[in-house]
Structure formats: structure tokens, C-alpha cells
Amino acid sequence: FSSRLRLMLYATKEILFCKEKYQVLYAPSFRGIEPVIFLRALGLYRKPIVIWHHTAVVNSSGFAREQISRLFYKGIDKMFLFSRKLIQDSLKTRKAPAHKLKLVHWGPDLPFYDHLLAEMPDRKPEGFISTGKENRDVSTLFQAFAATKEKLDLYIAVSCGNINYKNIIDGFTLPDSIHVHYTDGVIPYELAKLVARKSCIVICCLDFPYTVGLTTLVEAFALGIPVICSRNPNFEIDIDKEGIGITVEYGDVQ
């Protein structure tokens, strides 16, 4: 749904008028089920609600918005988060007690990647690759690699959320060593094979308060490929300490 309001209306109708028996309402995020969460907070919806919360819970600006937000989180029975830091930051707001917050580690489908690598016995990893679509910092990425002769392949969506990557990329005059590929229509399996043929994965992200780039990071684990990654304090794993790559500060082009 392009409209969030249309999504909420559709999801709320489907949930409230669902004829199938169920015990728990589970959702990958609260997006679209906000009205049902408020109904739960008011005692008008009886099923427990369990969601993934991709960011830390934060305080809202203004007294009225803060009170509405507190009521909203009262309607969520359990939230899964990707790191302890996200949980710790959420607890500081006092909107969600500890018993509602659960750490769940995000990881790769190892049999999938084992099968993929088994199909590529003669692969000879070479060059750098950057993938993903959420809040990627393509400007820093290009500036950093343009100053080197290293080969980089960027696979990215034309746009994601409020960011139009194509507009940003079109503003650069790129050297022959940097190649951009738009991923619209590219299936994950084919993209994973392209990643597996590279010697290093670059995860260059904007500074957002959640685990930006985590899926790309766990894919690197599964493929055994080192990473150069923005230093995201929300990751559960210390990339430098574990020796799986190096991290750099946000916006660092050196």
C-alpha cells in the first residue's frame, strides 16, 4: 500500500472481522495495525499483540504526543528487538517495561548459503560489493572509493522510503572502477551469488537509531566474507573485536 492510511484501514478490517480462530496477533512491525494496538490499550481488543520493533522506543515531542505514545505502547504485549542497546534505550523512556522487551538475534539461513556456495566450487572472490536499500550513504561510499583504484559494484534500489538513490547517484561523475546496478526485479538468490564472488562487502549507512545494514552483515557472516561497515552502535556484534572486518565512523571518506 502506498498510503499508510489505506494500509491501516485494510489491516484493521481484516483483523477485526477475521473468522479464523487465533490466539495471538503477530506482526513484523506496528505499521498498519496501529488502530488495533490502540484498541488493545483501551481494552477493546482481547488478543495479545506481539511485534518486531526495529528501533528503540523513543520519547515524543510535546506533552499530548507523549501521552498518546504511552497509550500506544500499553497496547503491545511483547516486542522483539535486535540488540541489547535497543532494549536499554527503550527502557529509558519508561514506556515499555523489561518484561515486554525480548532480544532476538537476527541471523542468516545457513543451509541456504551452504547450498549456494556448493554450487560455486570454482569461485575466485575479487573486488568490493555494496548491497542493501535502507538508509544507505551512497555519497560517502562514492567519495571513499573514487579516491582509490579499487573496483566497487553497488547494487541498490532506485529508491527506498524517502531516499531517491538514483537522483543522488546521477549527481556523481563516477570513475570506471565504480559500477551501479539497480536491483528492481533482481531476486535475492541471484544477488547473493553476486555477493559470494566478491572479496569484501561494504556496508555504508546513514546514522539512524536502529540496526541499519544488519541483514547484509549476517549475510557476510554466512558467506565468510570480511566487511567494511559503518560503526553502528546498535549492532549486537563488535565487528572489530570479533575480527570479521573493520568499522569506520559515519561519513568518513578516508
Which stretches of residues belong to each language-model region?
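Short N-terminal targeting/anchoring amphipathic segment
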Residues: 11-32, 50-51
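Membrane-proximal helix-turn-helix segments that form the acceptor-binding/catalytic region
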Residues: 12-21, 59-80
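Active-site proximal beta-strand in glycosyltransferases
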Residues: 24-26, 41-59, 106
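Carbohydrate-associated surface elements
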Residues: 85, 107
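Acidic anion/phosphate-binding donor-loop and adjacent secondary structure
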Residues: 91-92, 99-102, 108-125, 136-142
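Nucleotide-activated donor-binding/catalytic signature segment of Leloir-type glycosyltransferases, i.e.
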Residues: 166-197
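Acidic donor-binding loop of glycosyltransferase active sites
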Residues: 193-210, 225
